[in-house]
Amino acid sequence: MKIRAAIAGASGYVGGELARLLANHPNIELVTVTGNSSVGETLGSLNPALDKYSDLVFVENTKENLLGHDVVFLALPHTKSAEVATWLEDDVLVLDCGADFRLESAEEFEKFYKSPHAGSWTYGMPELLIEGNSKQREKLSGQKRIAVPGCNATAITLALAPLLRDGLVDPTDLVSTLSVGTSGAGRNAEVNQEPVLASAFAYQVGGIHRHIPEVQQNLQKSAKGQVSLTFTPVLVPMFRGILAVNTAKLLPGVDETAIRNAFTSVYGTESFIEILPSATFPNTSDVEFTNKVQIGIAIDEA
């Protein structure tokens, strides 16, 4: 018997991507899609490239429509998942793709999201370095409530965590500049597409981006000491993908061999993370529509 799945908020980009992934999963059957703005429309009307499940009809996002599934994906706007989560049975696997349950600190959540903190769920980044040489994967087994990591947070965390674990860089001088696709703003975002297609521009500059506390929370689990991050996202004329340029000051005596050894020891057996050869750097088109992450390494000798 297949696992019965529902997507709450399936009319957005995240919901559409979940439907695409589930369509190729041999053991899961998507049976319900909710979307209050699209009730009565078909999933295929918003996702023309979708073949399987294209005839599923959106229903209202209610408790009655979400009960009775084995797994429920919450693809709702930030701060909207907490209430919906209370509707669902304890034995149902619930994965929140929003930010409601990512942060452990209520103070940080309320500061960046301007909303009460609903608590934290098990963080869903299997490759994340935690205490000692352990990874978050060990904590995910058997969990019924999982917080899916943020996109920018994933790109920064995976790039910097091995360096911090091995004490190779100054943890108080981390800088991340991310070129991000327009889909990151969401389907209903008030983004004027004309200037986006003609230029690139920074947004949420000056330490106000909501992924900052999530990244710091992640990196603190690996770092030897406090972590300080400067993060600037730049919207560029591509639809999907992130190219993260992460820089950090090397500590004395650290060379490229030590850096490569750090990444290889952490990610060498990870199926979805590729450490690129020397002088080779990531290209978003190489990982588009995949689960893969590419990591390139360079030392500024100037």
Regions found by a protein language model. Name each.
Residues 203-207, 234-237, 283-287:
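Short Gly/Pro-enriched turn/cap motifs at secondary-structure boundaries
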Residues 135-139, 221-227, 251-258:
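Short, glycine- and charge-enriched coil/turn segments that flank and shape catalytic ligand pockets
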Residues 1-205, 224, 286, 298-301:
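N-terminal Rossmann-like NAD(P) cofactor-binding subdomain of oxidoreductases
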Residues 247-302:
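C-terminal active-site/capping subdomain that shapes the small-molecule cofactor and substrate pocket
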Residues 209-231, 235-239, 243-245:
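Oxyanion-binding "anion nests"
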